[in-house]
Amino acid sequence: LAIMSLILIAWTSFNNFWAVACEGKRLDEIGIGDGLVPETGLKKESPEKRIAMYPKVPPSLLSKEPEGIILGKYKNRYVRIPINEIYHHCILGGSGSGKTSTVLLDTLLANFATGRNGFQTFCIDIKGEIHEKSTYAYDENVLVCNPTDRTSCGWDAYYRLHGNPSDDLIIEAIEEISQALIISTNPKDNFFVENARTMFTGLLIYYFKQGENFIDSVNKILETETKSLIAEIISDSEPSDLHYKYLAKFAGRKNESIEDCMSEMTTSLSVFSKSDIKFMFRDNYQKASPYSFQEGKSIFLAIPEHMLESYKAILRLCTVQTLKEMERRSEEETTPILLIIDEFGRLGRMEGIFNALSTLRSKKVSVMLAFQSLAQCEVIYSKEETRVLTENCRVKVVCECADGET
């Protein structure tokens, strides 16, 4: 036994010496068990290159216990951003590269499954697997909104308009909805997009004043010929009415550009004609909203991946309303909130994301954007805007990179 032990010690010592001398491995990288299997090959990297490529992790980022934003492991310790350090993050990597299964899932597991609940979260959960794996079923502090699952929560788009809201609040809340649902995919379309938003805002204000809820208002817009609807509303309105200034300029117009604006509006709203969406926004008795965070809740927007293209307007609406509400959050709040926007590059343009990244750190709100590459992001945002997005994210995690510019 003694001879075997001596042979084993000699074998591992030789292999570790070889790894240091010929492979460029650092002495402080040698751990228990290293050297049992020899590292083959001659010197591939100089010690200087290895130090540059694999720098030591600062002790402040290391933890024995999983907590905060989990980035990985180093020498049997977790590499994490402490929960009290509020940074924005972007996670890049193609499909199957581990964006969801590593940083996103590990971070949420460390928060919910361990029972720490150090932060609340708003998470876009493509496939619906994140909340299933990271939270306990029937947790009263976790709200799951899934338009394809009628046992989940709905969404209250008019959450700010209950009671007796002022005219200014009505306009502000409805303009947020318009900006989220009707978006530009081409800078040349700005004229049509802006006018479609104005038209939609005016019609929503009119129906809200008539006592209609959000989903019924949208479907009345979809079910009626827009030009005749606006003409009828204006003929029965006074210039002092709240909706009048939004709709008057469209009444009686017959040029083709107005028709294009109307088409832009109805195309953007077509998803609300589906029965699952009507149930989510109207009939579901339990609805989540950005006010749910004030009650200590976390929200997961879950959706099957094959439905993402059809329902991305819904995800965008809920996300933009949440971003705007976070901007109104008091700086005195002590509980951090983590906003996870998975598949950010596939959701369409979010106007509020730039302000969010610029202002939310002071509100103890951290934004985490996950997308495939800068090239994917530049399909929606300009090259300069994409640079602004990434520069505002202090922590960048690259799981995979095939695009040279990324």
Question: Where does each model-flagged region fall?
Answer:
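A short beta-strand-to-loop transition that corresponds to the Sensor-1 phosphate-sensing loop
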Residues: 125-127, 370-374, 401-403
